[in-house]
Amino acid sequence: MEKVLVFGHKNPDTDAICSAIAYAELKKELGMNAEPVRLGEISGETQFALDYFKVEGPRFVETVASEVDNVILVDHNERQQSANDIESVRVLEVIDHHRIANFETSDPIYYRCEPVGCTATILNKMYKENGVTIRKEVAGLMLSAIISDSLLFKSPTCTEQDVAAARELAEIAGVDADSYGLEMLKAGADLSGKTMEQLISLDAKEFQMGNAKVEIAQVNAVDTNDVLVHQAELEKVISAVVEEKGLDLFLFVVTDILTNDSVGLAIGKAANVVEKAYNVSLENNTATLKGVVSRKKQIVPVLTEAFQA
């Protein structure tokens, strides 16, 4: 039987990795030869979840066409966030919870996108719809994805469906969602030992906003100053990325997981758009973004609107 690769976006977060594993397992149960893979390094937060539930991480690939003809995308749809040669393969399915942009296919596909906080929430429904029992370990990973994407249910992207799914999955996994979740988020917020290059690419995504090419990277921290103490070095590596990729804006967002506020470091010729979007003034290229924790709901649409205004 021909193999199908299942993967999330580049610079994968916990949902991208865990939903690839969970959906590949569901597809295998339904008779498909599916293998989860990843398009980037595994973060400390995701590794914590994999270790806790004793699951091996997917192997790393940059290109897919040399291996397979067909792929399934989870947690993304935009071409620039996908495999480097995504144009050379057929996308069979997409399971996602983001905006739909820069995406088209030559054939009809199964496309499931719901306005929930996490791909794993959708997968929880799909397991039920197909009458497949979720293994304890996979339930733990799916729970981890929801906790990560919802910042332990505090993000404005979090819906009642996400909370309900998390409670169900926690029961299957045999953990307390709140205490496990805080432990996992703290593991993800431990940025010690990371290079500046790693920090700005841990969870980074590229977007086309009007005519502007924008990259938004986000890291969680227990104290934003632990990251911003390295601002000069961060600006140096970000400026290099801006030049290399021809970006109009690179916004590096440091989110405090305790206060649920963020600090944005804006580099590029369109940095002033951040000021316009949030009605703030950049001081030394940074601004506090009160109550902003979600790239999907509080950054991407706000910046897109500002660029198009």
From Swiss-Prot:
Q: What domain of life?
A: Bacteria
What chemistry does it catalyse, as a reaction equation? diphosphate + H2O = 2 phosphate + H(+)
Q: What does this protein's record comment on cofactor binding?
A: Binds 2 manganese ions per subunit.
Q: Name one GO cellular component term.
A: cytoplasm
Q: Where does Mn(2+) 1 bind?
A: 9, 13, 75
Q: Which cofactor does it need?
A: Mn(2+)
Q: Which GO terms describe its molecular function?
A: inorganic diphosphate phosphatase activity; manganese ion binding
Keyword presence, Cytoplasm: yes
Classification via Gene3D superfamilies: DHHA2 domain, inorganic pyrophosphatase (n-terminal core)
Annotated EC: 3.6.1.1
The record's InterPro entries line, in alphabetical order, gives: DDH_dom (IPR001667), DHH_sf (IPR038763), DHHA2 (IPR004097), DHHA2_dom_sf (IPR038222), Mn-dep_inorganic_PyrPase (IPR022934)
Query: What is one Pfam family matched by this protein?
Result: DHH
Kindly list any coiled-coil regions of this protein.
Answer: none
Tell me which family the UniProt entry assigns to this protein.
Answer: Belongs to the PPase class C family.
Protein name, per record: Probable manganese-dependent inorganic pyrophosphatase
Its lineage reads: Bacteria, Bacillati, Bacillota, Bacilli, Bacillales
